[in-house]
Every structure is written in C-alpha cells, then in structure tokens.
Amino acid sequence: MEMACRVINRRRHVGLQQLLSFAQTGRSFLGPVKATKFITDAECHESVLISSTVRLLEGLDLTCAVGHLLNEAVQAQNNTYKIGTSTLLFLVGAWSRAVEDCLHLGIPTTVIVSVMSEGLNSCIEAVVSLQVPIHNVFDHMDNTSTVYKLETVNATLCPFLQDPSGSGLLQEKRDFKDATSPLLSTYSLSGRHAESPKFFKPQNNLETEKNTLQVLKNNLYTDSFCKKSALAHSRHFNRTDNSHWISRHDGFLEQLESTPKVLRCNDFGELAVGLSHGDHSSMALAKAAVRLQWQSLCLQQANWMAPFMFDISRLLTCCIPGLPETFSRVGLGYVTFVTMSSITLIKELQDQPFRVILIEGDLTESYRHLGFNKSVNIKTKLDSGELSEDSAEELWTNHVLQVLIQFNVTLILVQGSVSEHLTEKCMHSKRLVIGAVNGSVLQAFAEATRAVPVAYVTQVNEDCVGSGVSVTFWMSPHDINRSNRIAILLTAEGINLITAVLTSPASAQMETKEDRFWSCVYRLYHALKEEKVFLGGGAVEFLCLSHLQILAEQSLNRGNHACLGWLPDSSSWMASSLSVYRPTVLKSLAGGWHEFLSAIMCNTATHPSAVEARTFIQQHVQNAIDSGSPSSYILSEYSKLSSGVFHSGISDNLELVPRVYDTVTPKIEAWRRALDVVLLVLQTDSEIITGLVHTEMNSQELDGVLFL
C-alpha cells in the first residue's frame, strides 16, 4: 500500500510533511472506537483487515528515510510495551504540524527543540498528580484451598465509560468454559466466592452491586497522601527541594503535590473494566486469563504469601477462524493444531496418559546445536532425492524410533521443525509429534511432568521422560477448518500454562482480534507490574494541555522567566530568543494535545465536528486555568459522573459507569518517542537544507498565505 496522497511543498520542510502524511493514515485508530482499514497487496491483490498502527506500517510503502525512522520508533514502542503505538503515531503528526507552524513564524530550530523538549518534560512531571495507585487488587479474592467446580462462565460485559451511542450500555455475552480445570474457584466482582460463577455480573443483576459502586464513589476522595515527582531534580529547572511547582496564570505558584485527595483502585474487576478502552470482549478474556493464573497458583501453593505477579510468558493464543465468536475462551493447557491424519491416532490414545519428551531445537537428521563445529573431513553425497534404506536420514529415523520405543514415549514436543519422514513413521507406531512449540510451552510441560528438555533424541534417558500428559480434541473432529487441521488440547496436572482460543467467523478479522486481545492483556500486565495507572478518558492529555497554556500565559505576561529556571547558563542570544518565542512554541506544543483530544471525541461520535469538539475542550481548559489548579479541577470533574467533561456520551444510568484508566510508562514513553522523532527529523533536515530564511520569505508566493 502506498502512502496516503498529500501535496508536499518542496520549498517547505519535506521531512515534517512526510511525517504528517504517514500519521494521518492512522488517525482512525485513536480512542475506544477504532475504524478498521483494509490493506491490499498490490501484487497478489490479497486483503487483510487491520486496526493497529503496527499492522498499518507493515502494509505501507516505507521507502523514504522518514518512513523508516517512523517505523523504527513504532517498532521500538511495540517491542517494549506492545501498546501506545496509536498515540505515538498521532502525536508525531500533530507535533509535526506544530513544528511546521513554528518554522513559518521564523522561530529558530534550536529554540523549537529546546522549548518543546522542556515543555514535554514539564508535562510528564505534572501528570504525576493523576496517577492512581493499585494496591492489593487480589487480596479480596479468597486464596484458600476451598475449590468449586468451574461451570460455564456467562460473562455479560460491563460498559465502557464513553459509550458513543449514549442510548444504553454496551453489552455482549460470552461463554467461557474451562474444560481442563474443573476444580478452580470463581469469583464475583466484589472478590467473594460466587454462587453463580460469573466473572462479570449481568446488567439486570447489577442492582445488587449498588452498595459496592456507592462505596467506590464515596471513597473517591477519602485517601490522602502526597505523590512525589519522579523527576524531583530535573535538569530543566533550578529547584532545591523536591516540590513540584507550576506557574499559575495570575503569577502565583501552585504546588501540585499538595493535592490532598487522590483516587485509589483496590479491585481487580474495576481495574480491568477501566483498562478495557471499549473492547469489552477482549478484556473479558484477558481478565479471565489473569484470574485463572492466579487461581492455579493458589491451588498449587496453599501457603503462598508472596504478591501475585502475572506471568505473561505463560499465556498463549490460538486463532481458529470460521467459528462464531462465542466459542472464544481461555483455559489451562496448550491448544494447537494437528493434521487430519492424526485424528485417528488421537481418538485411540486420548483416554490414555502420554509419556512425553521435550526437544529444544529441530528434530531432523541435519540439526546441530548452536556452536557445533562440524568436522571438515566428512563429506555426505546423495545420488537421489528419494530416501533409500541405507540413507543417513533413514538410519537416523530408525534410531530415533528405537529410542522412543525403548522408553515408551508416545508424545514428542519439538521447539523447532520436525522431519516429515519421522512424523509419518511415528504416526504408524502410534506416537504423536508436534513441532513449532513455543519455548515457554516446553518449560511449562517440563515443570508439570518433570521432563528434562534435551537437544537430541540420543540424549534421552528415563530421567528425561515426563508423564501424565492428556491429549483431547478441543473441538469436534468433524469441525475441520480450511487448512485441513484440527485443534487439540494438551494438559497436565498442575501445569502453569493458559491458552486463549480466539474465534471469528471471518478470517480477515482474526489478526485484528488477536491484536486487540494482546493490547488488553498488556494493559493489565503493565498496570499490575507498575502498581499504578493514570486516570483515563483524556484526563492526562487535558492536564498537559492546561499546564502548557498556563506556562505560555505566564511567559507571555511576565517576560521574565528566571523563576522557572529555563536555561540559566545559556547565551544572551539564546536567552532573548527563548524570551520572545517560548509562549508561541508552548502553545504549538499544546495544540498537539488539543488535536489529540478533539480526534478522540470525533472518533467516539460524542461531537459531530472537530470545531465543536475543540470549542468544548477549550471551554473546559479555560475553566481549569481559572480554577488555579488544573489537577484539582480534573479530580473534581471525575467525581461528577454527570459533568460531561471526561464522561461524555455515557449512559444516563450513572450507577453503572465505571472509571477509565490508562497505563503510565507506556503512555509517557509514547510521548517521548513521538517528540524525539519529530525533533530528529527537524534537526537533521535543518543541517542539510540551506536558504531556509529565503524559503520562508517567499512562502507567500508559494502558498498564498504568510503566517504572522
């Protein structure tokens, strides 16, 4: 797919225009209501449905240097956090436009880089006041050895904070049935054992939860403590204490740390719903996976006292297209595919315990472990492509079978590829071989069966063989998909491995469904790992916008920035330039946040046009500035479910409105990477472009408009 068409003025900053063009293609991915796109291969004309920035950039023509740079930034964010790429892409475009506007006004590049970098760092310090601590979200759930039979879990999904329809709560039902663990406890949203094992209460039964919701509302401001800034000694400000100050518009200083009341999240159900971001079905699966891992750990370790840490490496996905979405579920064990030729074998052996060996690497005659030094004096020559009785592979295959027969091995899990000839031989001798097994799967089966992974079959002895593995059909043998494969389930007693089976009637949606599931999983993972989240619904971006406008007004009104500690040792020219241009650059940076919030409101259909959204935002920004404390204003508005600032478009039934949360570090790092990309392109092109002043003087002739 080629880059979205956009007229690029060669007399202006080409790199920034290219960034803006790339970023505009992913605008619809922002917010809880994401519009999907079709990516069509120009050569084979195959199409795939995508709704993520990573998939989008994989399908774009990134032949230019700017495209490669943007893709590297997005890939770095995705490889590290798996979330935040849509925010990164959008802010790259918004801040590219902001930098372009600054260049049109004749602001020096060094000033733009300096002020924008320090402005973002100031925002990052300011939003610390909107962090919500997460404490003991699993403590309310009973971790005793009392167990119950896990029945079908009917998960009626809780509403998202911003339901764009506004006419009712978004509901969707899923059935989650764990066929492999009939002795796991289930818990209600309040943390007690549930008589009816449901991860979420049905909407029509939520009247019984009013007391819980009322407690959450009453505790909104009951906790008081001072949050310390993570950047207490920033190099960008001259501070001698650990306080976090920002300048108010009237010239006084506000100490954000003095905010006496903060939110707190102590319930896992509330946390999961707040991090769903509109994708309730995926979050229901993610939440069920975390609960299942927690329950499994509690059963294995009755006296377990250490805090629970969600091990994301023990969670896998298995995508099965062609089935209704109601078949999606999570359960203990390993779900994978085998060919139709294995159906008869599994039917014969599914009621018997399997003895298993684990192979690290390939199970082929030519495989050698990493670091193996092959002798230079041995040469192998094959006269025919067909295997003969005396060939090396045939001899090797026979030797492998002898080892398997000697130790009565009926299941072989291989991390790499497997010889097709060996697979056929094993099938004839009623032995199942499964290749391309994830390393974490091997480790999980090693722990559960006491098997010892080996590199070669020749290393196998009795101590390396595990036992107690059961193999069953995950779905009916008659439900064969288009690739002529059947899904099977491998389990063992006490195994710490969970598979989320994702189904969809449309094959084109499978990739999108898997991406959204992992996004929900990683939001939960980062939140539980950091033990803190941000207030969501645009609250953090709103505070950044208000904070920058306060700084800009303060700079404009006073003209003397010594109290802020901006570059005290800089040259007189730099100091004078900062004094003149700082308000403009800060407002341009704030414009990126303004555009961000406006795009979310338009995508969620809470406002019919960008003009109305921007007007709505600016009105509340002014209210926040006039209040003297934007952070307190935001916390106050969060306590008013009917305020319409961070709860626009929600249902009229306010008792059913949950809080919205967002991750901390992934969001902040997405901001940093977005600005780094923009400023890097700006500085790189500025070093190789000459005649910049002449170009800007003639911009009126080129564009018809001269920015003043």
Swiss-Prot record:
Keywords: Cell projection, Cilium. It is found in: Cell projection, Cilium. InterPro entries: BBS12 (IPR042984), Cpn60/GroEL/TCP-1 (IPR002423), GroEL-like_apical_dom_sf (IPR027409), GROEL-like_equatorial_sf (IPR027413), TCP-1-like_intermed_sf (IPR027410). GO terms for biological process: chaperone-mediated protein complex assembly; eating behavior; fat cell differentiation; intraciliary transport; negative regulation of fat cell differentiation; negative regulation of stem cell differentiation; photoreceptor cell maintenance; stem cell differentiation. GO terms for cellular component: cilium. It comes from the Eukaryota. GO terms for molecular function: ATP binding. SUPFAM superfamilies: GroEL apical domain-like, GroEL equatorial domain-like. The keyword Oxidoreductase does not apply. It holds the Pfam family Cpn60_TCP1. The keyword Hydrolase does not apply. PANTHER family: BARDET-BIEDL SYNDROME 12 PROTEIN. Component of the chaperonin-containing T-complex (TRiC), a heterooligomeric complex of about 850 to 900 kDa that forms two stacked rings, 12 to 16 nm in diameter. Interacts with MKKS. Component of the chaperonin-containing T-complex (TRiC), a molecular chaperone complex that assists the folding of proteins upon ATP hydrolysis. As part of the TRiC complex may play a role in the assembly of BBSome, a complex involved in ciliogenesis regulating transports vesicles to the cilia. Involved in adipogenic differentiation. Belongs to the TCP-1 chaperonin family. BBS12 subfamily. This is Chaperonin-containing T-complex member BBS12. It comes from Mus musculus. The lineage of its organism: Eukaryota, Metazoa, Chordata, Craniata, Vertebrata.
